[in-house]
Curated annotation (Swiss-Prot):
Location in the cell: Secreted
Tissue localization of expression: Not expressed in normal tissues except in testis. Expressed in 22% of melanomas, in bladder and lung carcinomas.
Note: The ancestral BAGE gene was generated by juxtacentromeric reshuffling of the KMT2C/MLL3 gene. The BAGE family was expanded by juxtacentromeric movement and/or acrocentric exchanges. BAGE family is composed of expressed genes that map to the juxtacentromeric regions of chromosomes 13 and 21 and of unexpressed gene fragments that scattered in the juxtacentromeric regions of several chromosomes, including chromosomes 9, 13, 18 and 21.
Entry function: Unknown. Candidate gene encoding tumor antigens.
Record-stated family: Belongs to the BAGE family.
Protein keywords: Secreted, Signal
Protein name in UniProt: B melanoma antigen 2
Gene Ontology CC entries for this record: extracellular region
Amino acid sequence: MAAGVVFLALSAQLLQARLMKEESPVVSWRLEPEDGTALDVHFVSTLEPLSNAVKRNVPRCIIILVLQEPTAFRISVTSSCFVQNTLTKLLKDRRKMQTVQCATARETS
């Protein structure tokens, strides 16, 4: 298992524990994997099971796009596995965006 995956798994478990214990449903989290990618993530617990969001036909891509907004957002946290998958997707999307920006900057210069 790669170091980044282990980091995300541990972060997901800690994040879920904090959401369940804290009176305030908002948890801010800074991800800093070994590859140098840093990402600030803010979770707001809604106490709504993920299955309800799926029943309402909320696509995963919409949830991910909302997560990338700088404003507060909502996400249902029902398992550390779901949080881990979400954080992994966020980091991958951020890396892709940075790669495209670097390539675009090289082409225009």
